Amino acid sequence: MNQKFKVVLLSSMVLAACSVNAQNLVYTANSSSNAPISVAVDISQGNKYGIDLSNGATVTLDGPSISISLTGASNTGWIEGVESRGASSLLNLGGAQTKNINVSVNVDSSKPAVGLFAFKKGKITLNGENLNINVHSTEGQASGIYVQNNTTSETEGDKKASVIIDAKNTVINATSDNAKSSGIVAISQGVLRANGNIEINADKVIVARGDSTVRINESGTNTVVLNGDIDFNYSGGSSGTKIDADVLVNLTGASSQWTGNVRRSHDSEPAADKAQVTGFKLKVADNAQWNPTIITSSSIYKYVIN
């Protein structure tokens, strides 16, 4: 049975194993489904998200395939394939039987376009064989994954926004015709962990600041391909947090490589105590390659290369 509709889920429920075709999915209470999921959104009709989760709900979608597609034109509000926000909000995408998770955002807009967004303690986990995130915008910034907690002193890990990738293979492509693109953005104590094989293609493969945490191939057992810069960012016009973040990238094995640079960016010059990077760790081992295109002065980057 195929159904095509806007789904608003306000109470705890379980969806049977039938294909769900929807204009968008809104969750404010616990829910689960092992059905194939297909969400197609035309943003010119008003919706700006594919899956929206809030209110502390726990939602598990672990069917054989999950497809989320946003297209069209609009210049109002952020455009997001998936968002999980608020304390205890948890979206589990994919599981043991999931072959493909495809998130595509291809829009004509001047507003930010994002594939997956974990915001203010919201959490997203991703499991399965293949995770593909493709984000393109004509005029706005494009980001594959965005994780932002909006805190500076949170000490409890379960109170931080997070995206945990346990898919076997992940590919993130982010492009914009007239703005910057980022594969992963982790700011204000947001947490991102990518535990399988991963490839990222963007102007900036990682943007980090404000004591965020990024872990790429922490186990050292997977293949990592990065094409783009790693950027420690200062935004005086918004958060004003320091540019430092805890970023670990393990390039291990002959198939792993990074083409790009470590850099910093800012909209205004940060104070000296906010301008140093001490938390970046890069491991290049077992015939992996780092191919920097520009060697930047190390005076602003105190990073460790093993």
Residue ranges and their predicted role:
Residues 1-23:
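Gram-negative bacterial Sec-dependent N-terminal signal peptides
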Residues 23-203, 207-228, 234-259, 266-293, ...:
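Surface-exposed loop/turn motifs in large extracellular/passenger domains
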